[in-house]
């Protein structure tokens, strides 16, 4: 099994195997593994954004990727919320599980698709979604642009 397949399968699994694996690695290996995962997540994000743009081209607003969408996770009870945000240190003496079922098939398909996709062959910058309400630098740029626009409108009105 390829190392990236191993990593992605653990990462996408709904357990703490990925954290146990990272805890058992040295810092350099852990950071390298995280970089590998972010490259695949960037590819998935690019696919999602392009798909959203196709939907918007036919007039459908896909709320899950829009700026106004505020809910990322639906919680049926407080236990789900607690599980998601539990920051208890991981015990490293546990066994790492590896799902070799449909999740593993998904990982292999994702890796093949990324390798064969025209999107992956073009040089793209990492895809990041910028939320203007949370990104300070972007918010500052927007404030400058708005203040310049207000000054221009004021000068047009006074002349």
Curated annotation (Swiss-Prot):
Keywords: Host cytoplasm, Late protein, Virion. The keyword Protein transport does not apply. Pfam families: Pox_J1. Homodimer. Part of a complex composed of the kinase OPG054, OPG092, OPG114, OPG115, OPG142 and OPG157. Interacts with OPG175. Belongs to the orthopoxvirus OPG100 family. Induction: Expressed in the late phase of the viral replicative cycle. Late protein which is a part of a large complex required for early virion morphogenesis. This complex participates in the formation of virosomes and the incorporation of virosomal contents into nascent immature virions. Plays a role in DNA packaging during immature virions (IV) formation. The keyword Transport does not apply. This is Virion assembly protein OPG100. It comes from the Viruses. GO terms for cellular component: host cell cytoplasm; virion component. InterPro entries: Poxvirus_J1. The gene is OPG100. It comes from Variola virus (isolate Human/India/Ind3/1967). It is found in: Virion; Host cytoplasm.
